[in-house]
Amino acid sequence: MLAKRIIPCLDTIGKKVVKGTSFINVRVVGDAKELARRYEKEGADEIVLLDITASEEGRSTFVDVVTDVASELFVPLTVGGGIKNIEDVRRLLKAGADKVSINTSAVENPDLINQIASEFGSQCLVVAIDVKRRGKKSWEVYIKGGKVPTGIDFKDWVIEVEKRGAGEILLTSIDADGHLSGYDYELLEYALSYSNLPLIASGGAGSLEDLYKALKIGVDAVLAASIFHFGTYSIPEVKRYLREKGIWVRLD
């Protein structure tokens, strides 16, 4: 049985980690390198590092930040934000990333999914999907840091990215993000019914029960930010709780 993964998310602007609510009203919560090292020591299974304004501002990838963070990190590091082409991916992997996450560029150029999977392997490609609910069992895909609607139905997109060679999906509910009221569990169940890819749940974790419910549904990993950044829970607390509830997680 594969262990379920606990993944802290570091949303960055420059070298600073920030956190907002529904992708807006962000505030600085710390330094990227320091937080990454802290979470690794606490027992994080992976770290996700996202430049949250790169795509919106049309900037290239933050290679210098990745190099700095990766230099003293030994857990897998997934990096995203502003990746436009194969060369961006190559630079990030060379800088120390283990996986790359693409979102806006995947929607604007779906062939990039095929190209990355072919060049580097599906195992290093995460497709991040940000969605807003638009009705019963209906969600729309958003890009540019959750600010631009695409008109693309989530179901259609999740099926397409799997066919094109994505290795994993990072699924974020914009509606739930930062509100600490739980993941969109209906969205997670819906995604699992249409995709066989490993699924990372993101957006809304506020309690230990929230994490448990998502993992119980069948996601492979839970990503969280606020509960770790603001000291609500430590990673060891989370893992002990999940073990007690019968969820298999790695304990150091």
Curated annotation (Swiss-Prot):
<dbReference type="InterPro" id="IPR013785">
    <property type="entry name" value="Aldolase_TIM"/>
</dbReference>
<keyword id="KW-0028">Amino-acid biosynthesis</keyword>
<feature type="active site">
    <location>
        <position position="11"/>
    </location>
</feature>
<dbReference type="InterPro" id="IPR011060">
    <property type="entry name" value="RibuloseP-bd_barrel"/>
</dbReference>
<keyword id="KW-0963">Cytoplasm</keyword>
<feature type="active site">
    <location>
        <position position="130"/>
    </location>
</feature>
<protein>
    <recommendedName>
        <fullName>Imidazole glycerol phosphate synthase subunit HisF</fullName>
        <ecNumber>4.3.2.10</ecNumber>
    </recommendedName>
</protein>
<dbReference type="GO" id="GO:0005737">
    <property type="term" value="C:cytoplasm"/>
</dbReference>
<dbReference type="GO" id="GO:0000107">
    <property type="term" value="F:imidazoleglycerol-phosphate synthase activity"/>
</dbReference>
<dbReference type="InterPro" id="IPR006062">
    <property type="entry name" value="His_biosynth"/>
</dbReference>
<dbReference type="GO" id="GO:0000105">
    <property type="term" value="P:L-histidine biosynthetic process"/>
</dbReference>
<dbReference type="InterPro" id="IPR050064">
    <property type="entry name" value="IGPS_HisA/HisF"/>
</dbReference>
<comment type="subunit">
    <text>Heterodimer of HisH and HisF.</text>
</comment>
<comment type="similarity">
    <text>Belongs to the HisA/HisF family.</text>
</comment>
<comment type="pathway">
    <text>Amino-acid biosynthesis; L-histidine biosynthesis; L-histidine from 5-phospho-alpha-D-ribose 1-diphosphate: step 5/9.</text>
</comment>
<keyword id="KW-0368">Histidine biosynthesis</keyword>
<dbReference type="GO" id="GO:0016829">
    <property type="term" value="F:lyase activity"/>
</dbReference>
<dbReference type="InterPro" id="IPR004651">
    <property type="entry name" value="HisF"/>
</dbReference>
<keyword id="KW-0456">Lyase</keyword>
<dbReference type="Pfam" id="PF00977">
    <property type="entry name" value="His_biosynth"/>
</dbReference>
<comment type="function">
    <text>IGPS catalyzes the conversion of PRFAR and glutamine to IGP, AICAR and glutamate. The HisF subunit catalyzes the cyclization activity that produces IGP and AICAR from PRFAR using the ammonia provided by the HisH subunit.</text>
</comment>
